[in-house]
A protein has these predicted regions:
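Phosphate/pyrophosphate-binding active-site segments
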Residues: 1-4, 134, 157, 169-170, ...
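Generic detector of well-ordered alpha-helical packing
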Residues: 51, 162, 292, 379-381, ...
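Active-site-proximal structural scaffolding
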Residues: 222, 262, 360, 440, ...
Length: 578
């Protein structure tokens, strides 16, 4: 009996190593759903919202190298969009199968018709529609190959009637090829980099996620150069651990130590980073960048020279040419300052807060201390990113996932679904904001349906905390950032999972410890301080002025209590400003 296209697709996906598809089934996807069920190797994960499926696929792809989600014609396509933007901007390989209305109805404004080429073009590296049995397998292989090779999203539109059509023999390959090329600067370029670094008395290294696989080489380079090492949020888990030269992160979520090291150096070496915040980059230094995507060179900093290369391969060639710097005064100065910064962070943890105003720093540090050495963390965009960036420590085995480039809310819980399904033996903890969790709350039902032992920690500050801070820094009294939330603990129980509410700071440690010990999903709803602020590495006069203006306007509007609470909650930042 001949196969139909849906069955042919499943065969190719199995050969590519696909274990699951995240989707909401629908009429144009039904033949694919049925083929998956009958073949038996791939699990159909019934999410409640396609956006959650795309986020989950993005998480699995970042951890394992390739994942698949799907959406049916019309609304199913539109619901995928935000999650696919996240995957594409995060440079992770995801295949999105977008089943469409029947091909005979194309261009007629048919029920649930969407133009997938137009719709997905800005969030994909490959975007095509298969119209014939001959095209279908070739396009599927091409879509998978593009996703892997270009590290992005491939979208393949497939008319619902094509899935049930008789398949034709594929005239090209059914296999997907995961390559690992060696990319290094030329000999002349390596020599130039070595000469520059050897001539520098004060060198600072800044690493992104592209340097994560080169931990040993980065540390060896820093040892020779006596160079402090800073890193991006995404690069933290791959660089921070077992690293006597690290000085933390810079950027909006970072610490003044990395900012200081980069600005006091005479040479800055950027490794595998596409760090987007130009204001935190020095401008009067020799700046050298190495990246495996040469199109990124120079778009974030005023480079002296840029080079194409994988970081590990490049440093292996570079290290023998680097001379040992016997003077470590610059390094010692930066490490001493970093120790003061870390001591300051500890002081925030010691202040646990009060009833219904629990210190979020204390909560994050408690999670860090109680979590396993190989935990996979997911963090919501917003204040959860701040607390995760500053308090979740790398071990060499931990992973940290978030929306670091796209910056979407509501990502942490869906990403935890993908992380837990693909790594059932690992502890997965989602640090969720109340705003983010509220957006896609319904997929707690997915966690329950598959009995995923995810631990959801809600930083419930009853506000859009980051937006509130952004408004106040710009001199605007916050407006419509407050949230009237449901009882998340009770809601969790209504979904059929464990739910715990915590309002007393003295009960935080026990609640988190108990939650992590439960063999099953748990939601811990912690009432954190809505007025807790996060100070960036460098606080300018305009920011202080803006905050002062906002507080004054709020007092004139009669919001004296909120102003008083903000001051009381953030007295600990005074020494940073001064």
């Amino acid at each position: 009996m001949s196969k139909n296209i849906a069955e042919q697709f499943v065969e190719i996906l199995v050969k590519a190593g696909i274990k699951r598809i995240y989707a909401v089934t629908g009429d144009s996807l039904n033949f694919l759903n049925d083929a998956i069920k009958r073949e038996g190797s791939i699990q159909w994960i019934h999410v409640r919202h396609e956006e959650v499926g795309a986020f989950a696929a993005a998480a699995e792809a970042e951890l394992d190298g390739l994942a698949v989600c799907a959406g049916s014609s019309g609304p199913g396509h539109v619901h995928l969009i935000n999650g696919l933007y996240e995957a594409n901007r995060g440079n992770v390989p995801v295949l999105a199968i977008a089943s469409t209305c029947e091909s005979s109805e194309f261009g007629t404004s048919y029920f649930q018709e969407t133009n997938t080429i137009k719709l997905f073009d800005d969030c994909s590296v490959y975007n095509q529609v298969a119209n014939t049995p001959e095209q279908a397998p070739r396009m599927l292989q091409a879509a998978l190959q593009h996703a892997i090779s270009q590290k992005g999203v491939s979208v393949l539109g497939v008319p619902g009637d094509l899935f049930e059509a008789k398949s034709e023999k594929n005239i090209s390959s059914d296999l997907v090829f995961k390559t690992n090329p060696r990319i290094i600067p030329s000999e002349e370029e390596i020599n130039w980099i070595a000469n520059q670094l050897n001539s520098g008395k004060k060198v600072a290294i800044y690493c992104g996620i592209g340097a994560s696989e080169a931990h040993t080489e980065v540390v060896a380079l820093a040892e020779k150069l006596k160079a402090p090492i800073g890193y991006s949020f995404r690069g933290k888990m791959g660089i921070q651990y077992n690293n006597p030269y690290e000085v933390g992160m810079t950027g909006l979520l970072g610490l003044p130590s990395a900012f200081k090291a980069m600005h006091e150096a005479d040479i800055v070496l950027l490794l595998g980073t596409d760090f987007p915040y130009v204001k935190f980059m020095p401008t009067d230094k020799v700046i050298i960048q190495i990246d495996d995507k040469p199109e990124r060179l120079g778009r974030r900093a005023q480079l002296t020279r840029g080079f194409a290369g994988k970081i590990k391969d490049s440093l292996i060639n570079l290290l023998p040419l680097i001379k040992i710097n016997d003077n470590q005064d610059f390094l010692d100065k930066q490490l001493d300052f970093y120790q003061k910064v870390k001591n300051n962070l500890r002081s925030y943890v010691e202040d646990k807060g009060k009833e219904n105003h629990i210190s979020p720093e204390f909560v994050a540090e408690t999670i860090n201390q109680k979590a396993n050495k190989d935990t996979i963390f997911t963090v919501d965009t917003g204040m959860c990113c701040v607390w995760g960036a500053r308090y979740l420590e790398a071990t060499g085995e931990r992973k940290l996932l978030g929306s670091f480039n796209h910056g979407t809310m509501a990502n942490a819980m869906p990403m935890a679904i993908g992380a837990q399904l693909s790594h059932p033996d690992k502890q997965v903890i989602a640090l969720c904001g109340d705003g983010g969790l509220s957006m896609l709350l319904g997929d707690i039902a997915t966690i329950k349906q598959y009995n995923l032992p995810i631990k959801i920690i809600v930083f419930n500050n009853r506000s859009l905390g980051m937006v509130k801070l952004e408004m106040e820094v710009n001199g605007i009294p916050d407006n419509e950032t407050d949230m009237v939330n449901p009882d998340f603990g009770l809601l969790a129980q209504a979904f059929g999972i464990n739910g715990i509410n915590v309002t007393d700071p003295e009960k935080v440690e026990t609640a988190i410890q108990d939650a992590l010990a439960i063999d099953g999903p748990v939601l811990v709803n912690i009432f954190t301080d809505p007025n807790a602020l996060a100070m960036p590495p460098k606080v300018g006069w305009e920011q202080m002025k803006g905050m002062g203006v906002a507080m004054t306007k709020m007092m004139l509007d009669g919001n004296l209590k909120e102003v008083a609470d903000t001051i009381t909650s953030n007295y600990k930042h005074i020494k940073e400003v001064l």
